[in-house]
Amino acid sequence: MTLPSRSALFKLGCRVCHELPPVERVQVEDHAAELRRNDALFARWAAGYGVIRHDPLTQVRVDAMLRRADEHAQGLDRSGWLGQLIAADRVASAGLWLVAHMTYAREVRRDGRALPAEAFKPMPEGHTGGSLNMVPAYVGYLVANSLSGMTRGWIMGQGHCVAAIDALNLWVGNLHPAHAGRYDLSDAGLSRFVADFYSYAIRSDGTPASPLGSHVNAHTVGGVSEGGYLGFAELLWPHMPLHGERLVAFLSDGAFEEQRGSDWAPRWWRATDCGLAVPIMILNGRRIEQRSNIEQAGGERWLHRHLRLNGFEPIGLDGRDPASFAWGILEIETRQQAQVGSDHPSAESARLGYGIAEAPKGFGFPGAGGNRAHNLPLEGNPASDTAAREAFNTAAQHLWVAPAELDAALAALTTHASQGRARERDHAMATRNVALPRLPVPDWKKVGTSSSPMAALDEYVLQVVRENPQLRPRTGNPDELRSNKFDRTLDALKHRVTFPEHGVAEARDGAVITALNEEAVICAALGNKGGINLAVTYEAFGVKMLGALRQEIIVARHLTEAGRPPGWLSVPVLLTSHTWENAKNEQSHQDPTLVEALLGEMADTSSVGFPVDANSALAMLRACYASHGRIVALVVPKREVVTRLTGEQSACLAVNGAAVVHGDPRAAQALLVAIGAYQLEQALQAADRLDEHQMRTAVICLGEPARLRQPRDAHEAPFTLDDTALSALFPTTVPWCSCSMRAAPWWQSSCCRSAC
């Protein structure tokens, strides 16, 4: 038997046999036919199931994978692997079947009987096409885990495709308590499951009645990102797995055009300090209303050229076939493992594998490949349209798997106990629990001296990083560290680059992720949840980070509400060269939008601080690193300012959000409230003038305004001052005047209780 050359397996990253050059195509087809003739079990798998077919190229690739089985088998031989691949086809078909029901049906019949009109939803909803495309992808991920005996993490950029994840996790029993207590595999349990999807029902307290969401949520097993903001998963994934961990990133071709920076991963990923990370784009060629830009520019072949220019090795996958996904995951990992111990960035072998899984949008159901596939692929509503109902029932019959056959397939893929590995719900990136770092006592500045708060933070960040070598550091930097007084951190951690420039603070293993793209660099910090992180930017440019930050805030809050609070170290975002320091660059560089938006979020997950000197900045940063699961924005002066607070006062300010820096509020005739360093200086000058005129004043430094608000729920309450603490600062009989960094008219009313 003559085996196809390796070039035939990878030629131009072909996904199916007909894309190969003629000679190699014949070679692969002949070899696949011989494999089927000589191995009955292989032939049974190769025959496919329902709408799932295995192209000859996939067959040959899978055979090559099986020949390496001894390296990965974890107790399985060739027949065991083939048995799992056969099972995967049945599970994928059942997944397609259930996803279609989630969109259209409110009743499920496991015996496969046709549904009558009353069994359908009067108002179907579902992002169906993308969800159908994700079914073979996620099954391929499950099979790769089972075949290799290793549980990988996953992230999905197209969060609206969550129906695929939830449906398959229900089939395989990979559930969190909210799903396990509500759904099962009976007709009644499955009917409740599909009826809950897009039900919009709410409880008396205003929370959703259904744990199913339109996007990845806290109950989506293994979910780490909502995926509602297209493009951020594409920026997060290379920074997510720690060395020794594994991740599969399912990416969107629509997000590829949405977000700059998704093709920069080869600049950041290194075999030396990153875990194995497999990016796979679901290339279905369509946005909501038209073809994607990739499709318009030339499709898969254009994308291959683009990716190679950016340091990737494109590998074509059949997006209709779970076996192709499983092979792609294991193949890309094998190529990455070959880089361990090697440092030859110019070598072809250093390219980062990138799977391109092409399939018609909505594969497996009527309407595939057209605009309708995005949401509701049928031409009518089966609840009221006979033709649409017949189309649904006919398509569902092709996807249906007999219960006994499906149960056997599900059992074949449930190998966690025998392999001693975690369930997919418990993968490393979904269960981060980072121990609080060692935080040295800061070098407190002497009251009355002048210093740059940013320079003080620079010194302290470096101390913390050196005290905690077990934590991988990442600093997100839109090319401003030196101008923002972070020289020491940059010199020690260095820009991460492919080819370092002599005499510049650059290194291949640098920990500073620098790009003139705020979304890309903030995602470096947000993705590194197993490490310690920081982002530094001009305040005005921070608003470009808002979408990514808000996604993290939402997910963290929902996890807390679900009883699984996030265990990653809180992430500080230093906003400097701020509104009161950047007048030289006109109003475009004086933009307080980010902090105004973050102040609207819940204070337990989103903190906005206004340090007034070096000591208060140090205390707030230290408090940030001593907490979990929060985004902490600090508006920090970079110019020298007078140190007003002692270390002890600063620590109290970081905890309470407010501190008295002059006078006694209970004895005062007027209170001056300052938010910000420059505002405090003016408030103190005003207090001196008023004192000279025999008007007793007290000056209160408000370091975290949200501490003064009326808590909006029980989770936020511990992060706000109680009435006793509030009245000690703001006696109700004393008038007060605020000197704020913000001119927005809603500032005081949104941050402070009316009792103030």
Q: Which residue stretches match the model-derived regions?
A:
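N-terminal amphipathic, basic-rich helices that act as targeting or association modules
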Residues: T2-V172, P453-D458, L462, N477
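Cofactor-binding active-site loop characterized by glycine-rich and histidine/acidic residues
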Residues: Q84-A114, A119-T272, D487-T489, E519-N528, ...
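Non-catalytic terminal/interface segments that mediate subunit docking, oligomerization
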Residues: L85-R90, A100-R109, W154, L410-W568, ...
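Active-site nucleophile and cofactor-binding loops and adjacent substrate-binding regions
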Residues: A119-V135, W154-C161, T207-E226, S252-A255, ...
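Alpha-helical support elements that line or immediately flank enzyme active sites
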Residues: V172-H176, T475, L680
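A glycine-rich helix N-cap at a beta->alpha junction
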Residues: L175-L190, W269-I280, L309, G503-E506, ...
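Thiamine diphosphate
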Residues: F193-P211, N217, G222-E226, M240-V248, ...
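Acidic/histidine-rich catalytic neighborhood of metal-dependent amide-processing enzymes
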Residues: F256-W268, L549-R557, L618
